[in-house]
Amino acid sequence: LDKKGGCILSYNGGKIVDCRTGETLVEKTLDPALVPELCAFAAAQDIAILTYNREGIVCERDKDEWANKECFTTKLPMIHVDDLASYVNYPVCKMLITLDPARRDAVCAAGQQQFAGRADLYPSSPFFIEAVPQGVAKDDSLAELLRRMGLTRENLMACGDGLNDRSMIAYAGVG
C-alpha cells in the first residue's frame, strides 16, 4: 500500500491513514470523559476492557481469555496496567470490551442504554463489544474515503470476517 498507494481504515473507520504519505486523513476519538466511564461500566459487569497504544494492547485484566484472543488476532503484545482509566491520557479511537459470549447481548444492551447519544457500542464477534465515538462505522468511513479520492461505490469492494463488517460489505456491494 505504501508503494502503489492505498489507505488503511482502522478502528472501525474511526481512523483513515494514507499509507504512501503516512498522513492521517480522518481521526475520530472517544470523548476523554468516556474512558473512565467505560472502564467503570466494565468493572461493574466484571469483564475486561482494553484499548491500544503504540506498543500494543493495554488492559488491566491481562490474563483475561478474551482479551488475549485480541492479542492473538492482532499479533500485538499485552501491556498490563493497574488502572486503565488513569493510564489513558491520550486520544483513543476505540475501546474493546471482552467477555464470555453468553453475556455479550445483555452487556451490549446495557452499554448501549448507558452510553446512548455519547458513544456507539456494538458486537463485533461473539466475545467482543466495540465502543467507538458516536457515528463511527465502516460503511461511513468508506464513503468518506471514496469522496476524498473522487471515486464511487462502483470502484469499491470490501472484505471482512466480523459482525461489524456487514455494513461495509453491504455498502460496497461486492465483498
Predicted segments — roles?
Residues 1-27, 32-33:
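Alpha-helical substrate-recognition element adjacent to the catalytic core
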Residues 5, 13, 92-93, 172:
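Short, well-ordered alpha-helix to beta-strand connector turns
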Residues 35-37, 41, 45-159, 163-171:
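Conserved acidic, metal-coordinating active-site core of Asp-based
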